[in-house]
A protein has these predicted regions:
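Aromatic-rich, lipid-facing transmembrane alpha helices and their immediate juxtamembrane interface loops
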Residues: 1-216
Length: 216
């Protein structure tokens, strides 16, 4: 796994954005979410909030300010977009953003144990769940919810089924890693998420053309 792999997983979402027509509005939102991703990671590294205190290794790209790898926005923002795509039928629900936050937390139940096992990052204090602090998962709910609020506020209509491919690739790959490393609970979670993403994509083939309608 390297920065190239992270960009590869992000590619379907980036292609979806490109197909939609890259305008100033989309660029501003994506840059804003990327800065948020870098900033919240740096805050957690320095203060322990919201993910718990941790430190990155050198395996996934050079670190911005010596703290956060530049690849983080390419890993995280596409997952946010994918979550809003997967749960798009619930968009009118008042708790839509929170549901996306919990969906992203489910993905992290897969990602974090594998990343810790491979030495991508190390927490100061772990837990019984594969040395990942439970606080970290609450942090994912919080940041995922906030990011979804921004995304859905910026775009009145978002149909971007192509972004589901990022979810599938990410979950399928990391569930395989977890299985190989003996992390069986995360492996099962990842397999379920991957199958769900694949089934969703099959059921919504006609909606796979990306459309972004900004709020005026």
């Amino acid at each position: 796994v390297s920065s190239i792999a992270i960009l590869g997983f992000a590619a379907p979402t980036l292609i979806a954005v490109y197909r939609a027509g890259v305008d100033k509005h989309i660029v501003i939102v994506l840059i804003g979410l990327s800065i948020f991703a870098l900033g919240i990671e740096a805050t957690s590294i320095l203060t322990g909030f919201p993910y718990s205190r941790f430190v990155y290794g050198n395996m996934i790209g050079g670190r911005v300010g010596g703290l956060v790898p530049w690849t983080v926005p390419f890993a995280w923002v596409p997952l946010v977009i994918g979550a809003t795509a997967r749960l798009a039928t619930l968009r009118s629900h008042p708790l839509f953003s929170l549901m996306c936050g919990f969906y992203l937390m489910a993905i992290d139940l897969l990602l974090d144990p594998a990343a810790v096992k491979l030495g991508f990052w190390t927490y100061e204090y772990g837990s019984a769940y594969y040395d990942v602090p439970l606080q970290n998962f609450g942090g994912w709910v919080m940041t995922g919810t906030l990011a979804t609020v921004v995304w859905t506020f910026a775009f009145r209509k978002t149909a971007h089924g192509d972004a589901i491919a990022t979810l599938f690739l990410t979950c399928a790959f990391w569930s395989s890693v977890c299985l190989f490393k003996g992390l069986y609970i995360p492996a099962v979670i990842g397999a379920l998420l991957a199958v769900d993403a694949l089934r969703w994509a099959e059921a919504h083939k006609k909606q796979n053309r990306a459309v972004f309608s900004p709020v005026n």
